[in-house]
Amino acid sequence: MSTTFCSSVSMQATSLAATTRISFQKPALVSTTNLSFNLRRSIPTRFSISCAAKPETVEKVSKIVKKQLSLKDDQKVVAETKFADLGADSLDTVEIVMGLEEEFDIEMAEEKAQKIATVEEAAELIEELVQLKK
């Protein structure tokens, strides 16, 4: 039988409202024979980010982004792609927005257009604006 002697255990919980301190000063005898620990490291599984925008909208936005940034045809541009990762600066982003407005026959408010950072965000905003237009 394996045992561990614990002379003092102290825990402290802090919250915005108050501080609570719990302290056990009496010796405690803890048996470790029936304890088991799962020490296997969890391996992260692949995950994908799903967007609310339709795949066709994402595809159109991707093509416009590639065209506006003069990217090669084999360059991968997907929903999660950030404009900055493609080398786009603020002027490029304005040109992308103008291309999107022309393609989808919409007008984006400047505040909303400035918040767009990914293909997914652009596609979601476009679908929202198209729905409002109807």
From Swiss-Prot:
Q: Which residues carry this modification: O-(pantetheine 4'-phosphoryl)serine?
A: S90
Record PTM: 4'-phosphopantetheine is transferred from CoA to a specific serine of apo-ACP by acpS. This modification is essential for activity because fatty acids are bound in thioester linkage to the sulfhydryl of the prosthetic group.
Q: Where is the Carrier domain?
A: 55-130
Q: Which InterPro entries match?
A: ACP (IPR003231), ACP-like_sf (IPR036736), ACP_chloroplastic (IPR044813), PKS_PP-bd (IPR020806), PP-bd_ACP (IPR009081), Ppantetheine_attach_site (IPR006162)
Q: Where in the cell is it found?
A: Plastid, Chloroplast
Short name of one Pfam family for this protein?
PP-binding
Keywords assigned by UniProt?
Chloroplast, Fatty acid biosynthesis, Fatty acid metabolism, Lipid biosynthesis, Lipid metabolism, Phosphopantetheine, Phosphoprotein, Plastid, Transit peptide
Keyword Chloroplast assigned:
yes
Primary subcellular site in the record, as a coarse category: plastid
Transit sequence range: 1-51
> What would you give as a GO molecular function for this chain, any one?
acyl carrier activity
Pathway where it operates: Lipid metabolism; fatty acid biosynthesis
Q: Which family does it belong to?
A: Belongs to the acyl carrier protein (ACP) family.
Job of this protein: Carrier of the growing fatty acid chain in fatty acid biosynthesis.
Name of the protein this chain belongs to = Acyl carrier protein SF2, chloroplastic
Q: What is the lineage of its organism?
A: Eukaryota, Viridiplantae, Streptophyta, Embryophyta, Tracheophyta
